[in-house]
A protein has these predicted regions:
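Peripheral, non-AAA+ core regions of ATP-driven protein-machinery
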Residues: 4-215
Length: 215
């Protein structure tokens, strides 16, 4: 019986990987920050078990509704993330000053256009987990008050109804992914300080963090 022989060592080029072995897979392109600052648009952050991370764009806008601040959610959001949306709406509305909220209610009574539509683009990518809670809260608050959110900022952190922000996982992957997307300012939970310190120690001699701010 005749067998094929294999020449060792085997040389595999980047071209082979991309166009031969992985030709049926789509190349991942990091999501970029918005072109400009705007009301109701914020950068959340994600990380997964595959060692990847990046930006989750979160958008909030009004839509016609007979119920004040009725939520409409789109963008393939999981159950945990949907719960975060509900918590965020309750918290954000409690943070808005009385005069502004009164004006929103008066506007609703006239227009019936104050339902809140929250959308996470890239609908083909499933999104779940509570770590976007803080970003969603800020996004809804921005919509209710008409205040712009800086387009270069990204925020991560689980949040409860009292406004306490708690720890999240994968901070290092989220920061690295955010940097690829153009983020220059990160906001993260105090409970993740050790993760942050470890990250800074690892990259302290790298120009990667030049002019990058953390809060």
């Amino acid at each position: 019986q005749k067998y094929d022989t294999i020449q060792l060592p085997i040389t595999v080029s980047n071209h082979d990987i991309k166009y031969k072995y992985l030709k049926d897979y789509h190349e991942y392109n990091p999501k970029k920050i918005p072109i400009q600052s705007a009301v109701g648009i914020i950068n959340g952050l994600w990380a997964n078990s595959m060692g990847q991370g990046g930006i989750i764009p979160i958008e909030a806008s009004y839509f016609p509704s007979t119920s004040f601040m009725e939520l409409k959610l789109t963008g393939l959001q999981g159950d945990v993330m949907k719960e975060s949306m509900t918590v965020a709406k309750t918290l954000a509305s409690s943070l808005v000053d009385t005069d502004t909220m009164t004006k929103n209610i008066e506007r609703f009574e006239k227009t019936k256009n104050q339902g809140i539509h929250i959308h996470c683009p890239e609908g083909s990518v499933p999104k779940d987990g509570p770590s976007a809670g803080t970003a969603i809260t800020c996004c809804i608050y921005s919509l209710l008050t008409g205040r712009n959110i800086k387009n270069n900022i990204a925020i991560t952190g689980e949040i409860n109804l009292q406004g306490y922000v708690t720890a999240i996982g994968g901070l290092n992957l989220k920061i690295l992914g955010g940097l690829k997307g153009g983020v220059t300012e990160f906001i993260f939970p105090k409970e993740n300080k050790k993760d942050y310190d470890d990250f800074i120690e690892l990259y302290k001699d790298n120009n990667l963090l030049l002019n990058i701010r953390f809060h």
